[in-house]
Every structure is written in C-alpha cells, then in structure tokens.
Amino acid sequence: MEKEQIFQRNAGFFAFFLSGICAISSGVVVSILQEIYGFAYGMTGTLLSLMSIGNLLAGFASGMLPAKIGTKKTVVLLTAGYGAGYMIMGFSGWMLVLMLGFFMVGVAKGSTINTCTILVADNSGDRTKGMNIMHGCYALGALLCPFFIAAAMKAGNTVPMLVLAACGFLLWLTFCVTPAETKAMKKDWNIDKSFLKSRKFWMLTGLLFCQNAAETSVTGWMVTYFKGNGIISGSLSPYTVTVMWGATLIARLLIAFVIHIKNSYSAMIKMGIGCIIFYMGLMMASTQTTAILLLFAFAFAMAGMNPTAVASAGRMTSAASMGIMLPAASSGAIIMPWIIGIVSEYAGIEIGMASNIIPCAGMLLFSAAVKRLKE
C-alpha cells in the first residue's frame, strides 16, 4: 500500500474519531440548552431533526458539488459546519440561531461520514475490518465526549459548545491537509448504476434507515429521558452516552479483530433480535443499575449493524452507491427523533421513547428479508 493511501486511510480514522465527539455530543448539548432556555420537548425533537436534515442534504451535496467546485473544495466547505455550528450555539440562545447551528452540525456529520467511508474503504485491504475499525474510532470519540463536556461545564454552561467547536475546526484542518481524491471517488457516476436496480441494495438501505432511526433516537433522547423520569441522577445522566458508546467500541473492535463473521446476514438477524429484546427491557427499567446494564447490552447488540450492512453491499460499495445509500438511510434519523418529540409532547416521554421499538423491529425484518434474496 502506498504512503498516500495509508495517509488517507488514517486521516479517515482520525476524522471519524473527531466526528464521534462532535456528533454524539449533540444529544448532551440539546439537554444543556433545554435546561438553559427552557424550551419544550417538541423543540428538542426539532433541533435533533434539523441536524439529521443537514446530514441528509450533505450526502446529496457531496455527490453534486464536486462536479461544480471539485472534491477538495466540497469536503472543506461542508465539514466546516461542526466548528461553525457549535460556535454559534455557544454565543446565542435565539431559537433560529440554534436551529441553524444544529443544521450546520448535521451537514458536517453527513459530509464526514461520506468522505471517511470512501477514504477508508478505498484504501483498506480488508473492507469489513477497515469499516469496523473506522466505526470503532467513531465510538471512541463518542465514548469520550461526556468527559469533555463535564470538564468544560465547570467553566460555564456554554463552554462545552466552544470546546466542541475547537474539535470541529481540528477535523476541518485534517481534511484541509488530506488528499481528497481516491480511486473510488474518481469513478464516474455513469460507469455503473446497476446497484439502483438491486433489491439487495435497497433492502440494506432500509436496514440502515431503521438503524439510523433507532440509534439517533437513543443517543439524542436517552439523556433527557433518564433525567426526566428520575431513573438516573442529573449529574450522572450525561455519562449514559459513555456507557452506550463504550459497549459500541468493544463490540466493533471484537468484530474487527476477534470475531470472524462467516455469514453477515445471519449475524445481522441475531443483532436485530438482541436490539428488540434489550430495548424492551430498557423501557421497563426502573433502577439506575438495571437501566445502565440494559443500555450497555442494547448498544452492544446494535454496534455491528451499520458497518456490517455497509460491508455486505460488496461490489456495490462505491462513491456513487454511498452517495445514495447513506443519505437515504439517514432520513431515518430525521423522522424518528421528530416523532418521539411529538409523541412525548402529547402522551409523555415514556410513550415517546417506547415508539422507538418500531425501527428496532424494522432492523430484524430487513435483515431477514435481505438474507432470503438470491443475488
């Protein structure tokens, strides 16, 4: 492997680590902002959904803008959203400004995942291992984010947003010095669009839609849910993110280095069953210890779903296919947090969070369906 390929792959790992810090912190940040400004659950859901809308639009922009301004300029432009978004959150409490900030963070998140997926996938000898390591880096960043926020909170309520802005600008600088063009990113969209006619491709996209919906709802709402119900004390509730992403990191590293998955489709079915069982248990938990253990188990069960599903696309994994699969799947992260916010507003947060069992069931159904396909 050439030095430039190694540099691009490692830059993808590092950038995705920083993205884990910036993206997953949004669930804690929205809880902090809710306490500071006292807005309703509906606004919380709106902010999280705006972030997901930015994530979705970034995927499509990543496919369109390179033809106009070039790949490098596209990546540098879109990934600036982490630093800029969190910075304006730290300086203003106006709702429109906060909405813009979450949208910009979402744009950076979407552009980062698309870019890192190609940087790592195109420069890894073992695609499945590379994807799980990359997502493990993301989980490590997510694991550390509550500690960054807790330390920053000691200096003031708005300081966490400024610390996250600094992380965002570091990510942006990483892309500024990294060559953006890889073999996969140089492919012309007209070379092969056969994946658009593949039932397997759309089944995997549906699976990722449900995975995005379930995961984003938990990372975005769980802190608010635990604090609102008094299941976990306010000072400890932000560390539920650490529990979740600690489990995710362990599971992804095990898949990458220890567990050899012989049949990815059977593995995804087992993951889907685990997600349903543990999420149902999580919703029935009434004590701090039980809630933490079940959250760990739920995150562990879901951890391998995304990288395994993307790797299962096989020959269909390209710049063109990722430009459709990932943005389409990310719409699940728009819809479900918004639904939870609306349901919580009218029926209580318990019912709102319980509705997240629907995408959990969807993961199992799509996993079973894609296994039955003969392609």
Predicted segment positions?
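Helix-loop-helix hairpin linking two adjacent transmembrane segments in secondary transporters
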Residues: 126-127, 132-180
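Extracytoplasmic gate region of multi-pass secondary transporters
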Residues: 26-27, 199-250
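Cytoplasmic helix-loop-helix junction between adjacent transmembrane helices
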Residues: 101-136
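C-terminal transmembrane helical hairpin of 12-TM major facilitator-type secondary transporters
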Residues: 262-309
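Helix-to-loop junctions at the C-terminal end of transmembrane segments
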Residues: 58-71, 153, 251-263, 344-345
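Intracellular juxtamembrane helix-capping segments at the cytosolic ends
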Residues: 110-124, 302-317
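Helix-breaking motifs and short loop linkers at transmembrane-helix boundaries and internal kinks
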Residues: 38, 70, 91-96, 125, ...
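Conserved MFS/SLC helix-loop-helix module at the cytosolic interface between two early adjacent transmembrane helices
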Residues: 57-96
